[in-house]
Amino acid sequence: MSIVWSLLWLWLLLDGVVQAAFAPADKAALQAAVGTCEWSNCGTSGCLSETSDGSCPIFAASNDASGNPHGVIGEWDVSRVTSFESLFQQARSFNSDISKWRTSRVTNMQSMFHFARKFNADITLWNVSSVTNLESTFFYASTFNQDIGNWSVSRVTTLKSTFSEAVQFQHNLNNWITSKVTTMESTFNSAPFNQPLHSW
């Protein structure tokens, strides 16, 4: 039966009934798409409407540069992107479900959620094994409190300000392998973090 459904889906896709997921080729294309939806200013004149779950339905129905609908952000195929640097920086109301994003090629997550004050979506299962830069990733992400203790961070070289001002974050990171980290300056600056790190 699964073969039948697969063939049906392929037919619908080719017939234009089902749209392929938005698949940015690189960081620039992804940033351009995210930047179009003014998450940090929703509700003000000229900005897109945002629902309580942090999604941007009007944006999902709008078109990318190729004329195809962007679709729901959580369904985007970001598997070719290698950098998430500053992707949602200052997106103060962003809290969409991006748990399904395929992140295995990403090497840079610097400032990804910097000042994304409402972000607390589940990203616990992200594959971050290629990431080397976590500087300021959750800086002032003041609501974030997801269990990312099982992230594979063995290639990370900087944890500078990673959780600075992340005042809600309280999960055990003792399993993180930090042997390649060269700077931990202000990692938990102004964050009431109180979990064991004796294995670091």
Q: Where would I find each of the regions flagged by the language model?
A:
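Negatively charged
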Residues: 11-200
